[in-house]
Structure formats: C-alpha cells, structure tokens
C-alpha cells in the first residue's frame, strides 16, 4: 500500500525574469505588472483581484543589518529576514482581510482563487505519481473535478471532467516572490533560499486568508488538499 503526502511545488526565480525593461520602470510598476500577469491566468477571477492589488502598491524601505567589528563595518548586509520582512510588508499592504470584510464578492473570489491553486498544484503532483505507478489518471481527474465542483469552485465540464476556471498558481504567493526577487535578486540565486522564501510566502498568505474560509461554506485549503490526497491514495491502493 502506498500513501502520499504532497509537498508544495517549488518555483525557481530566474535572473532573466527580473531583467529591467528599457523604459524607466519603478519597483511599484514591476510589482503591478507581475500581479497582472499572474491574475490573467485566473480567467473569471483575474480582473477583480488584479484591481484590488493595484490599489495597494507601495514602495517599502527594507530592513537592513550591519556587520560590526570587521572590515565591512558600516555596510548594510542583506539577510533572509530582510527579504521576509519585505514580503510581509507587501502582503500587509494588500489588506486582504480588510477588503474581504467590506466586499463579500472579493472574499469569495479570493477563496476561489486559493482553492483553485491548491487544485492545480496537487492535481499535477498526484497525476505524476499515478502515472509512475502505471495507474490511469482519467478516473482520478474526474473524481477530483467533482470534489472541486462540490467545494463551490466555478469552472466547466470538458469530456466529462470538471475543471476549475481559475486553476493555476497562487495569486498572492507568486507576486510576493516576484516582487522580492526583483528588489533583492542576489538573495534568490541560491536554490535553498528560493525554497525557503517560497515556503515563507505560502505560510503568511495562508495565515492571512484562512479566516475567510472559516466565515464561509467552502472547505479550507488544508481540507481541500486532504480530499485530493485521499482520492489519489484510493487509486494507488487499488493498483497495489
């Protein structure tokens, strides 16, 4: 019997992704563009959430630390905490909970986008595992599609399989990482640091959005992920 526990996917931030454009561009402009690009992948959810992001563009002053008692004394030195503080400031500037409390439609669209990202990430990982075990993914896709539909996600049925309309990357995590990698590119060269920053961004985003699920009828991201894992485990057990 094979059980799986899914880990989150890791995104590598390539230097080519953060090269400055020819026009004179500010950090605020780049942050807005990165958000717009991500939101475009969320079909029906993209416009409303992108508008919310654009209302909260700010230029933050990063925290700096200094070496003492050596040749580099007095020079600001970037640390992981500097980058994490920057991402937290960016997230706070979006005021997700505040906007959700004023606008029920925004709250629901945010929940839909988060669950759609959970669906997409876990679907891909489960399908790879099932294929590696020689298991057909068609029944699995149909069942997790039904789970997504039962969770209240909008979407459409193609070839008998329901697919959420907003399936894709997390609309809050990706812009945070993109913005931080643009401001502190040298901190994202190391793969282990990329993984650490990605995990931190997911942690603070989930902490911010989870209360929205508690006030509604949709399952939390954790509950929805567990549902997908249980479905995948069922097909793996049948193949054993």
Curated annotation (Swiss-Prot):
<dbReference type="InterPro" id="IPR005414">
    <property type="entry name" value="SopE"/>
</dbReference>
<comment type="function">
    <text>Activator for CDC42 by directly engaging this Rho GTPase and acting as potent guanine nucleotide exchange factor (GEF). This activation results in actin cytoskeleton rearrangements and stimulates membrane ruffling, promoting bacterial entry into non-phagocytic cells. Also activates NF-kB, p38 and ERK kinases, which are known to be involved in the induction of IL-8 expression. Chaperone InvB is required for secretion, translocation and stabilization of intracellular levels of sopE2.</text>
</comment>
<protein>
    <recommendedName>
        <fullName>Guanine nucleotide exchange factor sopE2</fullName>
    </recommendedName>
</protein>
<dbReference type="InterPro" id="IPR035949">
    <property type="entry name" value="SopE-like_GEF_dom_sf"/>
</dbReference>
<dbReference type="InterPro" id="IPR016018">
    <property type="entry name" value="SopE_N_dom"/>
</dbReference>
<dbReference type="GO" id="GO:0005576">
    <property type="term" value="C:extracellular region"/>
</dbReference>
<dbReference type="InterPro" id="IPR016019">
    <property type="entry name" value="SopE_GEF_dom"/>
</dbReference>
<dbReference type="GO" id="GO:0030036">
    <property type="term" value="P:actin cytoskeleton organization"/>
</dbReference>
<keyword id="KW-0343">GTPase activation</keyword>
<comment type="similarity">
    <text>Belongs to the GEF (guanine exchange factor) SopE family.</text>
</comment>
<dbReference type="Pfam" id="PF05364">
    <property type="entry name" value="SecIII_SopE_N"/>
</dbReference>
<dbReference type="GO" id="GO:0005096">
    <property type="term" value="F:GTPase activator activity"/>
</dbReference>
<keyword id="KW-0344">Guanine-nucleotide releasing factor</keyword>
<dbReference type="GO" id="GO:0005085">
    <property type="term" value="F:guanyl-nucleotide exchange factor activity"/>
</dbReference>
<dbReference type="Pfam" id="PF07487">
    <property type="entry name" value="SopE_GEF"/>
</dbReference>
<keyword id="KW-0843">Virulence</keyword>
<feature type="region of interest" description="GEF catalytic domain">
    <location>
        <begin position="78"/>
        <end position="240"/>
    </location>
</feature>
<keyword id="KW-0964">Secreted</keyword>
């Amino acid at each position: 019997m094979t059980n799986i526990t899914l880990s989150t996917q890791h995104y590598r931030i390539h230097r080519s992704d953060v090269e400055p454009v020819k026009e004179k561009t500010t950090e605020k402009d780049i942050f807005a563009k990165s958000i717009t690009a991500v939101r475009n992948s969320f079909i029906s959810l993209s416009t409303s959430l992108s508008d919310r992001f654009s209302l909260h563009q700010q230029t933050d002053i990063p925290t700096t630390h200094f070496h003492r008692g050596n040749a580099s004394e007095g020079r600001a030195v970037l640390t992981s905490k500097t980058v994490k503080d920057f991402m937290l400031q960016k997230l706070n500037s979006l005021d997700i909970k505040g906007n959700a409390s004023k606008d029920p439609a925004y709250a629901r669209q945010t929940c839909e986008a988060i669950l759609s990202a959970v669906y997409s990430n876990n679907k891909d990982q489960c399908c790879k595992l099932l294929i590696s075990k020689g298991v057909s993914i068609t029944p699995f896709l149909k069942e997790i599609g039904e789970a997504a539909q039962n969770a209240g996600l909008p979407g459409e049925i193609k070839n008998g399989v329901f697919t959420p309309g907003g399936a894709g990357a997390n609309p809050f995590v990706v812009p945070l990482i993109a913005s931080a990698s643009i401001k502190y590119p040298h901190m994202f060269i190391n793969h282990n640091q990329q993984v650490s920053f990605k995990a931190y961004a997911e942690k603070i985003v989930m902490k911010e959005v989870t209360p929205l699920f508690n006030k509604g009828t949709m399952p939390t991201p954790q509950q929805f992920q567990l549902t997908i894992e249980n479905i995948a485990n069922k097909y793996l057990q049948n193949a054993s």
